[in-house]
């Protein structure tokens, strides 16, 4: 991967663009600190249901970078106000990418470890996701990649498993 920097206002760098080795895929990244939220009543993460959305557009799919610098599908833990894994997945997708969708049961792709719900959707245009909105999103990076280039990134284990399952189909 190689980098190019974007400059805005007062020559202040706010985002970097990362390109794959072939130059066909680009991802936007930004440095930001994870907001600290401490809830003394929160249970251990493995006790919570989690949900995520695999978003594809043609041969590319959407990845977000989390605060630990790993790339993966938009995903997260269910909150008390999430009525179902589906609403959790919709909320996480909006928070991390700005993309608003209404998922159906037909979008359910896999359930992993009995508590991780993965939905899969296709969208007609990559322009439905505004990559320049990254500073307002709950992620530190976002972009579209193809299957071959994705494996050059620091992928989450979950995303690796999803890509392996998709490549076997």
Swiss-Prot record:
Gene3D superfamilies xrefs: Nucleoside Triphosphate Pyrophosphohydrolase
Manganese recorded as keyword: yes
Stretches assigned to the Nudix hydrolase domain: 46-169
Any one Pfam family match given in the protein's UniProt record, by short name: NUDIX
Cofactor: Mg(2+); Mn(2+)
InterPro entries: NUDIX_hydrolase-like_dom_sf (IPR015797), NUDIX_hydrolase_dom (IPR000086)
Coiled-coil features, chain-numbered ranges: none
Record-listed E.C. numbers: 3.6.1.-
Disulfide bond entries: none
Keywords carried by this UniProt record: Hydrolase, Magnesium, Manganese, Metal-binding
Single GO molecular function: metal ion binding
Enzyme class name: hydrolase
List of residues binding Mg(2+): 92, 96, 138
Nudix box, short sequence motif: residues: 76-98
SUPFAM superfamilies: Nudix
Family: Belongs to the Nudix hydrolase family.
Protein name, entry field: Putative hydrolase 111R
């Amino acid at each position: 991967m190689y980098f190019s920097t974007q400059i805005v206002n007062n020559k202040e760098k706010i985002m970097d663009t990362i390109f794959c080795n072939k130059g066909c895929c680009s991802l936007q990244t930004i440095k930001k600190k994870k907001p600290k939220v401490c809830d003394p009543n929160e249970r251990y993460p493995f006790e919570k249901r989690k949900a995520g959305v695999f978003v594809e557009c043609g041969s590319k799919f959407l990845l977000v970078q989390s605060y630990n610098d790993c790339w993966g599908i938009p995903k997260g833990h269910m909150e008390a106000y999430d009525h179902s894994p589906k609403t959790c997945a919709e909320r996480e997708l909006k928070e991390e990418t700005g993309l608003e969708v209404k998922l159906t049961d037909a979008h359910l792709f896999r359930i992993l470890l009995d508590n991780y719900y993965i939905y899969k959707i296709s969208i007609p245009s990559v322009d439905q996701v505004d990559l320049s909105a990254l500073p307002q999103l709950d992620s530190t990076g976002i972009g579209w990649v193809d299957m071959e280039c994705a494996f050059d990134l620091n992928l989450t284990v979950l995303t690796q498993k999803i890509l392996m399952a998709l490549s076997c189909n």
